[in-house]
Design a protein with these regions (language model features):
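C-terminal regulatory/interaction regions
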Residues: 238-239
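Conserved beta-strand hairpin/beta-sheet module of binuclear metal-dependent hydrolase folds
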Residues: 2-53, 158-173
Length: 239
């Protein structure tokens, strides 16, 4: 049975499950919102997301209240729930589709998706959907960034940065061959390595891996070892 793992005071995740295949679901608590990375495909993932508390954060109503805290009347502001979908494969986003179809009720406010995942999800009622084609950042008590990432595995993939952690989903994995060898695209892999090197976080988090978290250097070293096997006039590298 999947279990909930705490990475820091602000970050926890529900581990991957296999029947059905359901990716790790990450929850990052900002000062004003939960930032949820992927939604999985199983009922336990729905329960995990729905159980994230919207406990109000107290803020002072005015600058005058800031200067006189004893007389300040706090304003209760419930936490928002923002979902970031890494890519369009069903083990990462099925529960959003199930929500849209009325099969389950998923508690969230805004959905951030890449172009391909946006097409899979389709139109949404009573929820905001934002299609991400360029990096967007938020100061939410911690640094939050949602950014497209070049990869061989799935078009339109997104990563989520939360301070010193970057959640990559399946972006470092090859394109699945479905009966033929899995492969990396040479040009895209080169772009990905360059981008990953430019990122500040030192903790790289890969879906479906035991323990989830890897050192930045080890992930880049592995990808560079794959890239080193490229052959002249060949567009792909067998994984």
């Amino acid at each position: 049975m999947p279990r909930i793992v705490k990475l820091s005071d602000r970050i926890q995740y529900l581990q991957v499950s296999y029947e059905p295949l359901s990716a790790d679901v990450v929850a990052v608590r900002g000062d004003s919102a939960w930032w949820i990375f992927d939604v999985g495909a199983c009922d336990m993932a729905v329960d995990f997301i729905n159980a994230l508390p919207r406990n109000p954060v107290s803020e002072n109503a005015s600058q005058g209240a800031l200067e006189n805290r004893e007389s300040a009347a706090p304003v209760s502001i419930p936490l928002q729930k923002n979902i970031v979908i890494s890519h369009f494969h069903r083990d990462h986003l099925l529960n959003v589709v199930r929500h849209c179809d009325g099969e389950v009720s998923l508690d969230f406010d805004t959905l951030y998706v890449g172009l391909h995942a946006s097409k899979v999800v389709g139109e949404m009622n009573c929820r905001e959907k934002r299609t991400v084609t360029a990096p967007i950042s938020f100061d939410d008590g911690i640094h939050i960034e949602v950014l497209p990432i070049p990869n061989s595995h799935a078009k339109g993939s997104l990563a989520l940065i939360a301070d010193d952690y970057v959640f990559l989903g399946d972006a470092t994995y090859p394109m699945v061959g479905h009966g033929t060898p899995d492969v990396y695209n040479v040009q895209i892999l080169e772009q990905q390595i360059k981008m990953l090197k430019s990122l500040s976080p030192t903790h790289f988090c890969l879906s479906h891996k035991r323990g989830l978290v890897r050192d930045k250097s080890s992930v880049i070293q592995f990808l560079e070892s794959v890239y080193a096997r490229r052959q002249k006039n060949e567009n792909y590298i067998v994984a």
